[in-house]
Amino acid sequence: MIQKQTWKDEIRILITDEEHIGSVQISIPLYVSDIFGKADALIYALFVDYNHRRCGVAKRLLQQAEQQAKLNGVKTIGLEFHKEESDTFVLKFYLKNGYKPFNKESDLLIKKL
């Protein structure tokens, strides 16, 4: 399921899988800003129920999020990864799916779409 909301200054897209065991959200600003670093949009809140992890749900949700971003004109998408708060398999997942660190000091990972 995909829900799209257009706000005053951004588009927000919520994607949930068919079984309602995972979801992801995208924020696309409607103005030129450096708020997202070098990305045109930001993925946040990618979540999969603990009992359904490592079954491909997160990858499908991430691919759908990237597809929706492309449909809305996004060329570069980013997400924040906090080493102190997340397991290392999460970082490996994003790197495997084409995300690269913006720089050594930043928690921002980016991907060209």
Predicted regions and their residues:
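Conserved beta-strand-loop-alpha-helix junction that forms the acyl-donor binding cleft
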Residues: 78-91, 110
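Conserved acetyl-CoA-binding loop of GNAT-fold acetyltransferases
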Residues: 94-104
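Residue-level signal for alpha-helix termini/capping positions
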Residues: 70-71
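Conserved acetyl-CoA-binding loop-helix of GNAT-fold acetyltransferases
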Residues: 48, 54-67, 92, 96
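Residue-level recognition of the GNAT/N-acetyltransferase active site
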Residues: 44, 49, 82
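Short coil/turn motifs at secondary-structure junctions
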Residues: 29-31, 51, 84-86
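Acetyl-CoA-dependent GNAT
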Residues: 1-44, 104
